[in-house]
Design a protein with these regions (language model features):
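PRPP-dependent phosphoribosyltransferase catalytic core
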Residues: 228-331
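Core catalytic lobe of class I
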Residues: 1-229, 294-296, 305, 311, ...
């Protein structure tokens, strides 16, 4: 499915082209009003002007969002409490999570503590909303039979590295977000075929992620140079997302029962085939380190071929076929 639409223009004007309650998910990374260079003057507003700008676009976001929809909002510390109040008190939205994006490297300070996180607000339009927990689970370090086979809820502290200027996938944009963060939002709060809106598209991370996860996506962008960057990005070869939670390839150290080990490996291989095929090698290496070389019956190529040959089978048939992919040591 390819239904990715990028629109050039001011977000407040472009919102008018979106029908009421037609969007399933909004991911918004607006200018923080810190004077960054986005190729326009929209990051240097007076305090009150910035709040009014925020109030206006948030009202539009609320209008176009379905009753089951979710908005994720990146925001700096200076204004986040004000935008929280607008969402909760003025728009009557439901706070779901205050997410902390933790990164290990940032700007250094000599008179104060160096910043190492950004904040993300997650609000739902109503108490009935989409949340696909099984698509975003993280393997535990130690497995317990009462635990879900796919792992645990990743929590509201997310560790993803910045996209540094020296990285080959860095785009000419001052606040490019890691694809892994957006991937988690899209998987958690939308389904295949749903419509995602990014009113401040920037370098096009949300559109790129939706392109790969079979979501429709609409992006607004004011700077024509970024439009070209986004188009180039969407037309480039896909070699996997540029970041992921490093815990995803973790293998529990205490899968003592053979049947549970088999099921665990099968479940995770299915997940990697769907979302992170390029990480299968790392996962298999970790399995072998913990449970021995004989833990994997099929090679990586055989696993990939199995995926290609299974596109026309039902989910139950795929599950049955994949039961033969992984074996572990006898007790």
């Amino acid at each position: 499915m390819q239904d990715i639409n990028i629109k050039l223009g001011d977000a407040l004007e472009l919102f008018k082209s979106i029908p009421d309650e037609s969007v399933d998910l909004i991911i918004a990374d607006p200018p923080y009003n810190l004077g960054k260079d986005y190729g326009n003057n929209n990051d240097t507003k007076d305090f009150d002007d910035y709040l009014e700008f925020s109030r206006n676009w948030l009202k539009e976001a609320h209008r176009v969002l379905k009753s089951t929809g979710t908005i994720y909002l990146f925001m700096g510390v200076r204004f986040i409490s004000y935008l929280y109040s607008i969402l909760e008190r003025e728009l009557n939205m439901e706070l779901n999570s205050w997410i902390t994006w933790y990164y290990t490297q940032g700007i250094g300070k000599t008179k104060g503590f160096s910043p190492r996180h950004d904040d993300i607000l997650m609000f739902n339009k109503s108490k009935k909303f989409i949340f696909n927990i099984d698509d975003i689970r993280i393997p535990q370090k130690y497995y317990r039979e009462r635990n879900n086979m796919r792992g645990a809820n990743p929590g509201n502290v997310w560790e993803f590295s910045h996209i540094h200027y020296c990285q080959k996938n860095r785009k000419p944009h001052p606040t490019q977000k890691p694809e892994g963060i957006i991937e988690r939002m899209v998987l958690a709060s939308s389904n295949k075929g749903d419509t995602v809106l990014d009113p401040f598209a920037g370098s096009g991370t949300t559109l790129r992620v939706c392109q790969q996860l079979d979501r429709k996506c609409i992006g607004f962008e004011l700077n024509p140079e970024y439009i070209q960057t986004i188009n180039d990005r969407l037309n480039s070869e896909f070699n996997g997302f540029d970041s992921l939670d490093t815990r995803i390839t973790r293998v529990p150290l205490d899968l003592r029962k053979k049947t549970i080990r088999d099921e665990y490996i099968q479940n995770h291989i299915r997940w990697f085939l769907n979302y992170h095929e390029n990480e299968i090698e790392e996962f298999i290496k970790n399995v072998k380190e913990v449970y021995g070389e004989e833990a994997m019956l099929m090679s990586i190529e055989e696993i990939k071929n199995s995926k290609e040959n299974n596109y026309d089978t039902t989910d139950d048939e795929k599950e049955e076929q994949l039961k033969f992919i992984a074996v572990t040591r006898d007790e």
